[in-house]
Design a protein with these regions (language model features):
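N-terminal membrane-anchoring/stem segments of glycan-assembly enzymes
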Residues: 1-57, 244, 421-428, 472-488, ...
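Hydrophobic helical membrane-anchoring modules
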Residues: 3-10, 38, 437-452, 456-460, ...
Length: 510
């Protein structure tokens, strides 16, 4: 046998080992997440949301909404905030130099007026141009509603401006093109009150495509009409909800979605704020490098907070709840999905490079010896490795270098095993606990009431590895390529919006 044949055979064997390890880890995540899901669903019996609402230990919080060219969805998104059930909250909308009618529409629809407010620049940002405030007819629970207009500096810079303008000890980071469930804040704080060590908590993001939206809230959960969006529903459950739930259980989570997360403000300020080129904080420069920025600020800030916790040996952690607390719109065209996944991959590469000192470093515990290597191997190295495998293994079989048994083993581990993991993840999401007399009994992570919807998702879970995954791999590889050649920018995709314009709680209250 020639050296070429030996190399190809060895490479094929490495692929077999890779898929065996990857899908075995994913299945282990499902098992861990299933246990956590059951625990949290059962916990509702003893933790009614009314108790959280009335608890003196539930602190006020700031909701920070960075907005850039969100004219299509901004009214629906802000209207949903006015209906959130929480005892005391302030809403801070940061217009990041929008070039469309975002700011004008906010002012016109809600009645904001320009005025001066207390603003302390604890984190260095791009210049602020002005402040607007709504002082009359505030919705129930809203103690302050402010709009900050600033020069464009990116989402991370807008979040830092929101932190500077906030007056509460906790803040919520969210996207302007998303909808927060009306009970989301109470559900998240239910977990935080149970574990005082949590300094950050995130939640599952649901896809609003196919759902019925009224008055800024998802009233009925449905499945998308688009096959591309249906595959994403399965992917969100398997990779995001299940994977992050398991990593959080291990105290090794590396990302909280920028769509929704609750942070202790003092911790974020101590680590220097969200990463931008404007930051002057010592820890931000020490951890990530001076004058750097990122297209995935949500992952970078979590990794930096995790480093801070580990290095200071704090009894703190980053938490996660698998419940769908927030809803966002999934791209329904290949071009838009490609832009999104390209950016995600570039952001992953930036974060892995900035924080490369974590790799196999014992001072970071499970973060260093498991979570970080997992992302390096399976999210970075795995993308080109898998793609090459899908091309070369069938080709080597056709050329006679590999036997039919080897091809069968490859397909079993890469396609069949992967389908089993996806189906298991959907089943975990659909699992319903019916214990005690809780008003939320029988609830599940996936809020589908029609069994046919679940049947469709299970079918797409079986098909996910037959085309969709390979397309995603290609875009991830493009992201790696663009990262190495210095590509920057978000490349936002055009959104359809959430439906008809809602009535506004601020106007209703007035």
């Amino acid at each position: 046998m020639s050296w070429t044949a030996l190399f190809l055979l060895g490479f094929s064997a490495a692929l077999i080992l890779y898929f065996l390890l990857y899908n075995s880890f994913q299945l282990a995540f499902v098992i861990v997440a299933f246990q956590e899901v059951r625990r949290q669903l059962r916990g509702r019996v003893y933790e009614d949301l009314d108790i959280v609402y009335g608890s003196p230990f539930t602190p006020p919080l700031s909701i920070i909404v960075p907005a850039y060219n969100e004219e299509t969805t901004i009214v629906e998104s802000l209207s949903s905030l006015g209906r959130l059930r929480f005892p005391r909250m302030e809403i801070i909308v940061v217009n990041d130099g929008s070039t469309d009618g975002t700011l004008d529409r906010i002012i016109r629809e809600f009645g904001f007026r320009r005025m001066e407010i207390t603003y302390e620049e604890r984190i260095t940002t791009r210049p602020v141009r002005g402040f607007y405030e709504l002082r009359e007819g505030l919705p129930s629970g809203v103690i302050r509603w402010v709009v900050v207009d600033k020069e464009n500096g990116g989402k991370a810079d807008a979040l830092n401006v929101g932190i500077n303008a906030s007056t509460c000890p906790m803040f919520v980071s969210m996207d302007a093109d998303s909808l927060i469930d009306e009970k989301a804040l109470l559900q998240a704080f239910r977990v935080m009150l149970r574990d005082e060590g949590i300094v950050v908590i995130g939640g599952q993001v649901g896809l609003v495509n196919g759902c019925e939206v009224r008055d800024g809230q998802v009233r009925k959960v449905g499945i998308p009409d688009s096959s591309l969006a249906r595959f994403q529903v399965v992917e969100y459950v398997r990779s995001f909800s299940i994977g992050r739930t398991a990593l959080a259980r291990m105290n090794a989570i590396m990302i909280i979605s920028g769509v929704f997360g609750i942070f202790r403000k003092d911790v974020v300020i101590k680590v220097g704020g969200y990463l931008t080129r404007n930051l002057t904080g010592k820890l931000a420069a020490e951890y990530a490098g001076k004058g750097r920025d990122t297209v995935c600020e949500d992952m970078e800030i979590i990794v930096r907070i995790q480093r801070y916790i580990k290095e200071k040996r704090l009894a703190s952690r980053v938490g996660y709840t698998p419940e769908p607390l927030c809803w966002t719109e999934a791209p329904e065209t290949f071009e838009s999905l490609g832009k999104q996944r390209n950016r995600w991959m570039r952001g992953l590469m930036e974060t892995l490079w900035y924080h490369r000192d974590i790799l196999f470093n014992p001072r970071y515990g499970k973060l260093g010896w498991f979570a970080y290597p997992f992302f390096v191997l399976f999210e970075f190295v795995g993308a080109p490795l898998e793609f090459i495998g899908y091309v070369t293994v069938p080709l080597l079989y056709a050329l006679g270098y590999l036997s039919g048994k080897f091809l069968f083993l490859f397909l079993t581990l890469s396609v069949t095993y992967g389908a089993l993991v996806s189906v298991s993840a959907v089943v975990t999401g659909a699992w319903s606990e019916r214990t005690g007399h809780s008003r939320e009994r029988g609830s599940s992570l996936l809020k589908y009431r029609d069994w046919r919807h679940l049947a469709v998702l299970l079918a797409y879970a079986l098909l996910e590895n037959l085309g969709y995954r390979q397309v995603i791999l290609w875009w991830r590889i493009r992201g790696i390529w663009d990262y190495y050649f210095g590509k920057k920018g978000w490349e936002k995709f055009e959104r359809k919006g959430f439906g008809e314009a809602p009535t506004h709680p601020a106007k209703e209250a007035g």
